[in-house]
Design a protein with these regions (language model features):
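Short beta-strand-to-loop acidic/aromatic patch adjacent to the donor-nucleotide binding site
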Residues: 82-92
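Conserved donor-nucleotide/metal-binding helix-loop-beta segment in metal-dependent transferases, i.e.
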Residues: 96-114
Length: 210
């Protein structure tokens, strides 16, 4: 079995985090190696009340705000598995089998940088033909150059290969990371029938890197 670690970023929104974890564990059907949550708000302990409810999760805190990308680098440095399933604290999963589905796709091409699990109707990012049938699931490639600078790389819920990571902070923000991988020929895939939707509308937290 392919080993997968989950890394989740949060920023002192424990109500959203709890809902995200509730839905994740309700619909996840894959055996995980580890599950890490890193909170970057600087409010140490803000998520501690969730420890009893989710005993398999490792809760980490930055004592001072580092920014999302540096927090991700910090957690990825602890990942020892070939794959990392990356999520944030404001998502709702609603269908089983999302990690298995991603694993069926991620290694089909060395240039697949990530496989999205987001409902395609929940994102404005367009896809391009053709639609591939992978074990009965429709999969499409995300378009390069959406809105001039988005090429598919995302911190939205998605599976990534840890070997493709060598430190994000040295590249820049999410937008700049997307450009970096695009220039190296990488692309992303998304399912025609998704597995999760964004649940944090109107609750955006300004990142230190913005």
């Amino acid at each position: 079995m392919k080993e997968v670690t989950v890394v989740c970023t949060s920023c002192n929104r424990p109500d959203l985090l709890e809902k995200t974890l509730d839905s994740f564990f309700k619909y996840n059907t894959y055996q995980l190696s580890e599950f890490h949550i890193i909170d970057d708000s600087g409010v140490v302990g803000c998520n501690d009340y969730l420890k009893e409810k989710f005993p398999s999760v490792n809760f980490w805190y930055n004592e001072v705000n580092l920014g999302q990308v540096k927090s991700i680098d910090k957690m990825y440095g602890y990942v020892t598995t070939p794959y990392v399933f990356h999520i944030e604290e404001d998502w709702e999963f609603y269908k089983e089998g999302f990690i298995e589905a991603c694993l069926d796709v991620i290694d089909l091409d060395e240039k697949i940088i990530c496989v999205w699990t987001r409902d395609p109707n929940d994102t404005p990012h367009p896809t391009i033909d053709p639609t591939y049938d992978i074990n009965g699931r429709g999969v499409r490639r995300l378009m390069w150059g959406f809105d001039g600078h988005w090429h598919g790389f995302t911190f939205n819920p998605s599976l990534k290969k840890i070997k493709d990571w060598n430190g994000y902070a040295q590249i820049g923000r999410e937008l700049e990371i997307s450009k970096y991988y695009y220039e190296k020929g990488y692309f992303a895939m998304i399912f025609t029938d998704g597995y999760c939707r964004h649940a944090g509308w109107g609750r955006h937290v300004t990142d230190k890197g913005e």
